[in-house]
Amino acid sequence: MTHNAPPRLDPRRTPLVAVAAAGFLVALKGTGAWMTGSLALGSAALDSLIDLFVSAANFLVLRRSAQPPDADHAYGHGKFENLAALGQGLFLVAAAVVLVWSGVRRLIEGGAPRQTGWGVAVLAISLLVSLGVAHTLRQAAERSGSPALRADSLHYATDLWVNGAALGALLVVRWTAWSPADPLVALVVAAYVLRAGSSLALEAMGDLSDRGLPEQELRRIKAIVASFAPRVVGLHDLKTRRSGGQRFIELHLEIPRATSFEDAHALTVEVLRAVERELPRSKVFVHGDPV
């Protein structure tokens, strides 16, 4: 008896799910913010509006980055994903600044949300939608290694905190009539969004500037090479970088001078395949140097 695995959504089409969900959440939260006057709910609506633009951009970027290398882009088009991730991070930082300004202004000028029951219902629905979309995007990001999809999944994971915090603020106002809870929660959300956006932008800038792979992955590469001793004496000039969801790894093997040309070539291929098995989605270049 065989069991068929459930169909998986093409990672290049996954952003369409995010676009549809973000559009729904913008309309839902925007209406709720207008009805209640809640700054916390308004901040959640702004966050979803950013998600809408970002998810739409990701759909276009993933189609572009999936194209094979060509004469003008010999190493592929993965950097488009890093550019998209950088843009998303900067969008989040900008949104956080707007939230801080709005929160401080509300604390100074005063004011309280109205019809909080509607706001509670809107945020409860938003939590469920964000949870489902975040799970879908995270799975797609893990399968594809896409920075753009990972960034999008981070947005919806952030939405869970944003929606939860806004929901808590409205419940406090509803039950205690303590109106400062609304702008205070908006400021807390702003701090969280600022941290997430900064981290995302810095990581994208690192990839765009060809920062090397993490030390943990470098140790794995060196361990693989060491496992071929004594046929391999050592390695040098290990160079790594990431472009989109793909790693690029270049290294020089130190091979005993007595090794024949044919054996040395076969050995470099063995090492190359071993590294690719250990680190999927890697483009590996191995050179053999006699010592």
Model-derived regions: residue spans:
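Peripheral (non-transmembrane) domains and long loops of multi-pass membrane proteins
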Residues: 1-17, 72-80, 192, 196-291
